[in-house]
Amino acid sequence: MIRYSRQPTDRWLSMTRLEVRIWNVLHEGPLEASEIIRRLPGTDYFEAMDAIHRMAKMGDIKPITDD
């Protein structure tokens, strides 16, 4: 299971609206991608997954694995 936690970022001006919404959802703590998307009503699943992966690649959020 992979959960994501938010990281400090200075990329606010270049984030999309969806990325900001995802980053704000993670203020409560690490969540799985499906839980993040569930907390964003009306959001397209595939668009949100793309944004989550893009944010992880950019370092805005950090993947945490349960090993």
Q: What positions do the PLM features span?
A:
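A short, conserved structural fragment
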Residues: A56-D67
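Short alpha-helical segments that sit at the start of domains
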Residues: M1-I22, E47-D50, R54
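Short helix-coil junctions and helix-kink-helix linkers
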Residues: S34-F46
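The DNA-recognition helices of helix-turn-helix-type DNA-binding domains
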Residues: G29, T43, M55
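Short capping segments at the starts of secondary-structure elements
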Residues: V25-E35
